[in-house]
Curated annotation (Swiss-Prot):
SMART domains: HATPase_c. Its EC number is 2.7.11.1. It catalyses: L-seryl-[protein] + ATP = O-phospho-L-seryl-[protein] + ADP + H(+); L-threonyl-[protein] + ATP = O-phospho-L-threonyl-[protein] + ADP + H(+). NCBIfam families: spIIAB (TIGR01925). GO terms for molecular function: ATP binding; protein serine kinase activity; protein serine/threonine kinase activity; sigma factor antagonist activity. Disulfide bonds: none annotated. It comes from the Bacteria. This is Anti-sigma F factor. Binds to sigma F and blocks its ability to form an RNA polymerase holoenzyme (E-sigma F). Phosphorylates SpoIIAA on a serine residue. This phosphorylation may enable SpoIIAA to act as an anti-anti-sigma factor that counteracts SpoIIAB and thus releases sigma F from inhibition. Belongs to the anti-sigma-factor family. HAMAP family: Anti_sigma_F. It comes from Bacillus licheniformis.
Length: 146
């Protein structure tokens, strides 16, 4: 059975935890393992933080959009902003690369997303924003409920 959820919220750092918890609560119906749930929460946190800090440059202007589709123990996650976009996507995907060293960012966001998810694709255009598509196949064990 297919189930979908869409949320939109203002690009404020205090909304990052709301996004993480909301997505985790929605995904919980598939009974993921604790590791799977933690990985998805971490990925949501990284993507939303990137949208807020880099996409909107921490301005509080604009929205972050999250779409989650659950189907046959697969999580399809899309996180989108309408911010400044990523000028050099290849460079941005390199471990330790950051455009905000003054904020003590580690530059590991995309690396974490790539390691925790089964598939990731990123679409970005200058001044048009960024869309990240992520896919995770969940195990069929019921470890979370045991």
């Amino acid at each position: 059975m297919k189930n979908e959820m869409n949320i939109q919220f203002t690009a404020l750092s205090q909304n990052e935890s709301f996004a993480r918890v909301t997505v985790a609560a929605f995904i919980a119906q598939l009974d993921p393992t604790m590791d799977e749930l933690t990985e998805i929460k971490t990925v949501v946190s990284e993507a939303v933080t990137n949208a807020i800090i880099h996409g909107y440059e921490n301005s509080g202007q604009g929205n972050v959009y999250i779409s989650v589709t659950l189907e046959d123990h697969i999580v399809y996650l899309t996180i989108r902003d309408e911010g400044v976009g990523i000028p050099d996507l290849e460079e941005a995907r390199q471990p330790l690369f950051t455009t905000k060293p003054e904020l003590e960012r580690s530059g590991m966001g995309f690396t974490i997303m790539e390691n925790f998810m089964d598939d990731i694709s990123i679409d970005s255009s200058p001044e048009m924003g960024t869309t990240i598509h992520l896919t995770k196949h969940l195990s069929k064990s019921k470890a979370l409920c045991n």
